[in-house]
Amino acid sequence: MSSAPPFAAALAWSGHLRRRLDAHPDLAAWLANACAHPVSANVLAAWQAELSGPDAPEVLPVEQCRGMLRKLRERVFLTLIVRDLGGQADLEEVVGAMTVLADIAVGTAYRSVAAELAAVHGLPREQSTGDPQEMLIVGMGKLGGRELNVSSDIDLVMLYGDEGETDGPRRISNHEFYGRLTRRMMPVLSEVDADGQVFRTDLRLRPDGDAGPLAWSLDALEHYLIGQGREWERYAWLKARLMPAQAFADSNPDAQARQLESLRVPFVYRKYFDFDALAALRALRERIRQDWQRRALARNGVDSANNIKLGDGGIREIEFIVQLSQLIRGGRMPALQRRGLLEALHAERAAGLVPEGDAQKLEAAYRFLRRTEHALQYREDEQTHLLPADPAQRAALAAALGYEPAAFERTLAEHRAFVSQTFRNAFRLAGMGEEDDSPAPARTPANGHGMRPHAGALHDIEERLAGQIQRDFPEHAEDLLRRTETLLGSHRVRSLPDSSRHRLEALLPAALTAAAQTSAPMDAALRLFDLIETIAQRSAYLALLAEYPDTLARVARMVAASPWAAQYLTQHPLLLDSLIDWRTLFEPLDFAQVARQLAADLDACRLPDGEPDIERQMNLMRDVQRQASFQLLAQDLEGELTVEKLADQLSALADLLLAETIRRVWPLVNRRPGAEPHLAVIAYGKLGGKELGYASDLDLVFLFDDDREDAAELYAKLGRRMTSWLSTMTSSGRLYEVDLRLRPDGDAGLLAVSLEAFEQYQRSHAWPWEHQALTRARYAAGDTEAGARFERIRADILVMPRDVQALRGEVLGMRDKISAGHPNRSELFDVKHDRGGMVDVEFVTQYLVLCHAATHRVLVNNLGNIALLRLAGEAGLIPAPLALAAGDAYRTLRRAQHQLRLKGVDKARVPPGQLAAERATVCELWQTVLQDGTIAQAEVK
């Protein structure tokens, strides 16, 4: 037996290693050499070839396969003992080597057994193509996540594509062929003989467990997952990975692989989070807390605190913490759809779902516990997770891991305490609100007999609501009773299943109570009923509002404050669950984080063949825009944002989404590898002036700076695809309406224009109103050099010499056209379009810029109307007090327009006495600058 330094720690701890070296003295020299290198996939492939023999056939006979795999497993296990305990191998090497071993073992055993069966029965064939059909072997759990421990079971699910039969002389159905294959394959891996075993195998994660067939068709799996799939199965399928196993020449399982992934992803990761699932996940957490194995261990006299997998603060609790966020958020955040635990934890940290410090502590705990788990298993090659109770053995374990006994115990206790506390708070950490030591939300009792409630049940709830309405809404009782009757009589409600109806019956009284406590009870009640009727067919949202009273109260406050907000929520109920964690809605939008996470999520939207899933990407961008806008809306309604700050934020969000759109669309139109887009997206109008509202269109112009011969065609195509990407109505709605009419020559012009052509047009052919529009234009997204060049061109155009009298006539004429296009025949004051309104301020500002930018270059900057008026006043172009008063008036008019929009008013009009002072100030500004014109003329030489 060797006692060389690389072996010292391993020999001191592992009785299994000592016995193997005693029995095979020549093994020491081989092991010393093997331990000098990481146990990589290439190393395992070389060992496999060596153990198979130089003349081995491509497919080994079953008995030869059995022996080779057991010897390969011993090589891997012994090498890892020495490298791991000697501090040479990190966790990634250990679990990676065991996973590669499992992939080799399963693939090799499959080929050997399949060849033996095919020799008798022929090949199973695909019905559609006649090609040989492979069995799909799915690795579950740690095998799927590529994180096997050194003495792990492997969980497998066996699947196949088409039903049919084999093509040999003794034909059997494909179903029977794969069942026999599975039955014969398992002993090759798991049977213990003189050489040991390769892996214990477990097939119980297949549909119906031990009661189900050994191999399932994909169609049968689909029916099972849709009809019977449970929450713990979502948890199980999260890590599921198709293993690299191919037995038949000329087979092509790619289509079946794509079909499998198209089943797995929506089953595990749901876009619309199901709050039934939330209750099931809570139950799963309790099952982990009170696992029957812990109780069994306690009954056997073993202290369950010594179990580092199942005990408090153990490995399974870390897995639950990480996977809970994946299950809750992964449907909307594809970047979280990772099989490996540490990969997923890193993605959650990057997404801001787990604080940096917590993520680091969880990772440190996981690495410590996994390394300890492996050390326990190295000792006697046993699948154990129990720490030794004997102090001497415990000290030996600490030494094997490189710790003094006291330091080991302290580190272990610190890690487990942190994991245990985090596990108890797992749902709060995942953004689902509740402190997890508090009781779960009360669940609505189910109808005991399971029958659909009869008309009497409808009558009962209507009577109960009538009494509540008469008490809490006496002045509007008649109207609200009529709305209640239409709601309960609607087809959506009458066709509800029992569980949803019971939720509705619990929700409606709670909704009335919440509405009664708002500033506008009747409005809130009617809008809540509209929302409830819209979401009635989605039991998840009924559950959310019925079981989270704080969330219902928040919804009531929002819809009471703004009918526009009520309509927005009704159109996008996906946003409701963001109200659970109210605090996060009031955090400032971190646009850098939004951009990083959006890019990561879009990158993860892939079809099974690796190509981008464009439909998912488009929907995801719409969902992100809705979520960010809703966050701003919540802050807006609570008075946390000024109108200017809100517009800045909405404009920054649009810029971000435009930039991401270029990145996603460019590869779809460009055919030159490595070429970058030299496109600048120029924002005009509200986006250009950073005055965007919640539902504003985007006025855009596409400019390019590229000398390639196909540039005009390429960038026109890019512009078309971008416009489609932004404005197409998908299942998640439309991102933005896009207006391209401000480009040179308008609708008659090219969709994308070179910067040279744009400059020439602006100098020689543009109308004065186009120069007015240019005062509010800015580079918004795309190539920064092209954007900078546009800004230089814009500045040059704005400082061109102009005939002031002619310009004044053009501006006045254009203002008259605007008025004619927005006639107001009412007695009300139109805040935007009437004389003394916002348009007057904007026209005056544009006129001042075009007249005076040449002599006052500060006016070239696109700073917004209020700032530009102030600068004009400071420069003496208009009286400074008037400039400040007009800026204040414009701010007030914008605020009034915004409040009216939130109230759902299409046209921002107010009684003539309202805003009279502001209107008078704007009229004075207009008269001073454009009617008298004296100041402007005096300043222009």
Curated annotation (Swiss-Prot):
Its EC number is 2.7.7.89, 2.7.7.42. Residues 1-431 are annotated as: Adenylyl removase. Keywords: ATP-binding, Magnesium, Multifunctional enzyme, Nucleotide-binding, Nucleotidyltransferase, Transferase. CDD domains: NT_GlnE_GlnD_like (cd05401). GO terms for molecular function: [glutamate-ammonia-ligase] adenylyltransferase activity; [glutamine synthetase]-adenylyl-L-tyrosine phosphorylase activity; ATP binding; magnesium ion binding. It catalyses: [glutamine synthetase]-O(4)-(5'-adenylyl)-L-tyrosine + phosphate = [glutamine synthetase]-L-tyrosine + ADP; [glutamine synthetase]-L-tyrosine + ATP = [glutamine synthetase]-O(4)-(5'-adenylyl)-L-tyrosine + diphosphate. This is Bifunctional glutamine synthetase adenylyltransferase/adenylyl-removing enzyme.
